[in-house]
Every structure is written in structure tokens, then in C-alpha cells.
């Protein structure tokens, strides 16, 4: 609630709102009048750890995350909300929510620097934690401290290494805010590639995937399915809406459809009408 003005006391006014300074000057009781805050804080938590600099088709996950963040930010600006963000890539780049286009433009500058194919990836590797879960866990923990209760929070990640600590942070964050999870996936994580031998890397470790081997193919398919189900179950148990966006998707179309169908009550602050004003 924001202070608006003080006026003369009227019978029935809450005495807890007395403006004692004005009362002392005027010699007559005055009360403070408040106006409900209209600008809702919108926070974007963006995962740019090494594994996000990956795609077999379409755009890198990191680039897709930046596109989605831009769409949400401009939709928030169009709706009169305050835009802030937290980019985590081994280090945290934090932007407190700001009104108008300033907050969005500041966020975009950080995203351009952080998603550069060479500089962004190298910075992510240089500051990478021992596990990506550490980065997501600390980002969620930090967001709980800085986010004003009632904020609308979007988490953009592939959600690998999700664990019980992260699930606990999600629950605590959800208790006082509206939270939306956006999982960015590559087609390779939805179905195995054609039968062959492939070199694979997460940016830090290298390996071989032989889909000609029946055992490896089954294990790989099962691993992908289990990860998908684990993330979906974690979000469902905490009443957090979950959107899957592929690196080959049209981000604007997927986001607009999701907002119009799934977020009518939870995240109506950023409406589909506002999203339609944005084009990447």
C-alpha cells in the first residue's frame, strides 16, 4: 500500500491510520489515506549454466530462454508492471524490479552479454559450480529474500539436477508468490536420435552415445522420460504451472497459448493481450 494523502478524521476511520504529525500541526485528528499498489513486481529467474548453451535443432536453450524472458518483460511493461531479474550462471546478476521500460532494457543488456555464444559460455564455465543444482538452489534462495510478497516469478531452466533442496525452495517461494516454471527442452531430450554413434557434451564433460546399442537406447529413453516426469511431478505437487518449450518452438505462440489457457487465475497480471503486443 502506498501513502496517498492525509485527511480529517471521520467517524469509523481506523485509529491505527492516525497521522500524528499532521494532527499535531492542525490541532484536529487526521488520518493517512493509502492507495493500493498497482504495479506488480515481475521477476525472471534465468538459468544460463553451461548445459543451457546447447541445442541439436533450433536455437540454443540459452537463446530461447532470453527470447522468452524478453516476451514476458515487454508484456509486463505493457501491463504497467515492474520488471526485475536474476541471471544465474555460476555467478548471480541481479536486477531489482523497476517501472517502465528501464527495467526491461537493463535486463536485455544483461541477457545479450550472458548469451553470447563464446563470451557467455566461457563466463558460465569459468564461474560454474560443482553442480548446476547449486546454482538453481542459491538463485531460488536469493529470490525468496529479494522478491516482494505477491510477486509474479518466472523460472526459465531445463531443470536438470533438480533435488529435494530445490523442491523445498520452490515450495517456500510459492507460499508467498505466484510462480511459473518454464522448462526449455531440446528435441534430443524428447526422443533419441537415429541409430548411430554420437559424441555428447554438457559443456564440461564429454561422452559417447551409441544408439545402435539396444541397452544404451533403452537407458537413454528411460532417463529422458524420468527427468520429464520428475520435473512435472515436482511442479504439480507445489501447484506451480509448468510450460514446456522446445528449442524449435515459436516462443511467442507457445507463451501466448499457455498464458491464455493456464494462467487466467494464477498469472493474469501478464495477459495474453499484452503478450500479443510483443514480437521478436
Predicted regions located by residue number:
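Intrinsically disordered, low-complexity, positively charged segments
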Residues: 1-9
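Exposed, interaction-prone extracellular/peripheral surfaces
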Residues: 8-13, 22, 31-67, 74-280
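N-terminal low-complexity, intrinsically disordered segments
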Residues: 16-26
Amino acid at each position: 500500500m502506498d501513502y496517498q494523502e492525509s485527511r480529517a478524521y471521520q467517524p469509523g476511520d481506523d485509529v491505527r491510520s492516525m497521522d500524528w504529525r499532521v494532527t499535531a500541526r492542525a490541532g484536529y485528528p487526521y488520518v493517512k489515506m493509502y492507495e493500493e499498489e498497482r504495479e506488480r513486481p515481475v521477476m525472471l529467474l534465468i538459468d544460463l549454466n553451461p548445459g543451457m548453451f546447447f541445442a541439436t535443432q533450433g536455437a540454443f536453450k540459452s537463446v530461447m530462454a532470453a527470447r522468452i524472458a524478453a516476451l514476458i518483460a515487454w508484456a509486463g511493461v505493457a501491463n504497467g508492471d515492474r520488471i526485475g531479474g536474476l541471471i544465474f550462471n555460476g555467478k548471480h546478476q541481479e536486477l531489482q524490479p523497476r517501472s517502465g521500460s528501464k527495467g526491461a532494457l537493463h535486463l536485455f543488456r544483461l541477457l545479450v552479454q550472458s548469451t553470447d555464444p563464446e563470451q557467455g559460455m566461457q563466463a558460465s564455465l569459468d564461474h560454474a559450480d560443482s553442480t548446476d543444482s547449486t546454482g538453481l538452489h542459491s538463485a531460488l534462495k536469493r529470490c525468496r529474500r529479494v522478491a516482494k510478497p505477491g510477486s509474479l516469478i518466472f523460472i526459465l531452466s531445463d531443470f536438470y539436477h533438480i533435488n529435494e533442496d530445490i523442491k523445498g525452495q520452490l515450495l517456500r517461494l510459492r507460499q508467498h508468490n505466484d510462480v511459473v516454471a518454464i522448462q526449455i527442452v531440446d528435441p534430443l531430450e524428447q526422443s533419441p536420435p537415429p541409430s548411430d554413434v554420437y559424441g555428447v557434451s554438457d559443456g564440461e564433460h564429454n561422452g559417447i552415445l551409441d544408439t545402435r546399442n539396444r541397452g544404451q537406447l533403452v537407458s537413454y529413453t528411460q532417463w529422458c522420460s524420468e527427468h520429464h516426469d520428475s520435473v512435472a511431478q515436482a511442479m504439480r505437487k507445489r501447484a506451480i504451472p509448468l510450460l514446456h518449450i522446445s528449442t524449435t518452438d515459436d516462443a511467442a505462440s507457445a507463451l501466448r497459448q499457455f498464458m491464455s489457457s493456464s494462467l487466467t487465475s494464477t498469472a493474469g497480471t501478464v495477459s495474453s493481450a499484452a503478450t500479443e503486443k510483443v514480437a521478436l
